[in-house]
Amino acid sequence: MSTTVRPDEVSSILRKQLAGFESEAEVYDVGTVLQVGDGIARVYGLLKAAAGELLEFPHNIMGMVLNLEEDNVGAVMFGASNAVKEGDTVRRTGILASIPVGEAMLGRVINPLGEPIDGKGAIETSIRLPLERRAPGVIYRKSVHEPLQTGLKAIDAMIPIGRGQRELIIGDRQTGKTAVALDTIINQKGKGVYCIYVAIGLKGSTVAQVVNTLEKHGAMEYTTVISATASDPAPLQFIAPFAGAALGEYFRDTGRHALVIYDDLSKQAVAYRQLSLLLRRPPGREAYPGDVFFLHSRLLERAAKITDDIEVAKKMNDLPEALKPMVKGGGSLTALPVIETQAGDVSAYIPTNVISITDGQIFLESNLFNSGQRPAINVGISVSRVGGAAQIKAMKKVAGTLRLDLAQFRELEAFSKFGSDLDKTTKAQLDRGARLVEILKQGQYIPMPVEKQVAIIFLGTQGLLDAVAVDHIRKFEEDFLAMLELKHPEILKSIEEKGSLEPDTANGLKEAAAKFIITFNEKAKA
């Protein structure tokens, strides 16, 4: 047997081997941690990093680029920074911070990175949208004209909210801000509005309570809760509202209606201040960074009512590629930001900023809350700048004088404390005002359909309730509405379907009320 080596055979074998060789090498842009602590890392070597880009730290901790400096990058970390040390390798991902979106997110509790935290398993969705996105331009918008009913008489009558509006809920702690927001979510049942509740810096127990309340009222079916609690790192609290806006934009741009609640933005501003100071950005008023106004304006401007023209909507600025095939016109994103004040001071920095950005505010007062008026809305300084155009005709008609009547009542009430001898007209006005205040009181988590609101407010403003004792008004309201549903459903149906209070419907309502008041008063005396 010949043992001679044949060079041509060897070279052909080598050629075959080389032809089948595949390079498995992957190229990563990596940097080195120079300094780390308090959730902030300074990284050297990431020359091509982009602002808002995600970084991968050791131990699967994600971070995000916030500062681009001459010789290093300032990054915030979404996990425990004590697991990372000086000299560790950091990898660029090339992806801007984004969140998974889709119908699969409904009914779930997630963190601001889109990861489920409710123990119900993974979320199956293929679309991701960037957290930061420019607001739709003027040409892609439509003026607010459809109502978003909160189910709260005081708001729907005097401070109406329209789809695509930004309405601020502002007040001291423990005045019912979250309750107003939750009532609004519960009232969207069956109305085709998808809700996103963003909890920023709240206690974990409070978030659990919110989820429990929504589940109890069947509202989690159309709601997503995004939670960044007080124990979560400041960077997560900072990006949480942007995650909520991105999820809301998915529904808005696919021709549907969404409602996002930011509870609350004052805590997001505090988290942003913390990050900015640690990144050595220059402080401004109340130590907030100079761009804290831009932080909130760029977030809240993303709430909009989109034009009905699909062809125009498809050309919307900054539209992510993943959404382009699904775009439809006529969608909306309504924002209800919450701001907490200190001792009723609405002239502080963050409250004045957000008041100037939004289309109106609902101001809740602790004095009213403690006196038993709930929701504790101060009608005097609460306003809706664009919601009037979205209010249904029936409500506009019956509640037209309500704000003025209440303002006069408050003035006369203060005046009447000084003197006991009041003339008949003043006394009548005070009695009417007391009944109107009583009408606007409402229990928690029992939002009322708009047709029932119209019916009861109509009785109050027309003076039909003057014959009912003030302390019996709440009971009368309950019994009267139950009677209407049972014996005169056509009245409520007419208001609901036509959206206006026709003369024959108004007369029918007056007659039904007059008869019912007599029997009600007889029962009350017995």
UniProtKB/Swiss-Prot annotation:
The record marks S382 as: Required for activity. It holds the Pfam family ATP-synt_ab_C. It is an enzyme of class 7 (translocase). SUPFAM superfamilies: C-terminal domain of alpha and beta subunits of F1 ATP synthase, N-terminal domain of alpha and beta subunits of F1 ATP synthase, P-loop containing nucleoside triphosphate hydrolases. GO terms for cellular component: plasma membrane; proton-transporting ATP synthase complex. It is a peripheral membrane protein. The keyword Cell membrane applies. It catalyses: ATP + H2O + 4 H(+)(in) = ADP + phosphate + 5 H(+)(out). Coiled coil: none annotated. PROSITE patterns: ATPASE_ALPHA_BETA. Keywords: ATP synthesis, ATP-binding, Cell inner membrane, Cell membrane, CF(1), Hydrogen ion transport, Ion transport, Membrane, Nucleotide-binding, Translocase, Transport. InterPro entries: ATP_synth_asu-like_sf, ATP_synth_asu_C, ATP_synth_asu_C_sf, ATP_synth_F1_a_nt-bd_dom, ATP_synth_F1_asu, ATPase_a/bsu_AS, ATPase_F1/V1/A1_a/bsu_N, ATPase_F1/V1/A1_a/bsu_N_sf. ATP binds at G171, D172, R173, Q174, T175, G176, K177, T178. Its EC number is 7.1.2.2. GO terms for molecular function: ADP binding; ATP binding; proton-transporting ATP synthase activity, rotational mechanism. It is found in: Cell inner membrane. Gene3D superfamilies: 2.40.30.20, ATP synthase alpha/beta chain, C-terminal domain, P-loop containing nucleotide triphosphate hydrolases. Produces ATP from ADP in the presence of a proton gradient across the membrane. The alpha chain is a regulatory subunit. HAMAP family: ATP_synth_alpha_bact. F-type ATPases have 2 components, CF(1) - the catalytic core - and CF(0) - the membrane proton channel. CF(1) has five subunits: alpha(3), beta(3), gamma(1), delta(1), epsilon(1). CF(0) has four main subunits: a(1), b(1), b'(1) and c(9-12). Belongs to the ATPase alpha/beta chains family. This is ATP synthase subunit alpha. It comes from Chlorobium phaeovibrioides (strain DSM 265 / 1930) (Prosthecochloris vibrioformis (strain DSM 265)).
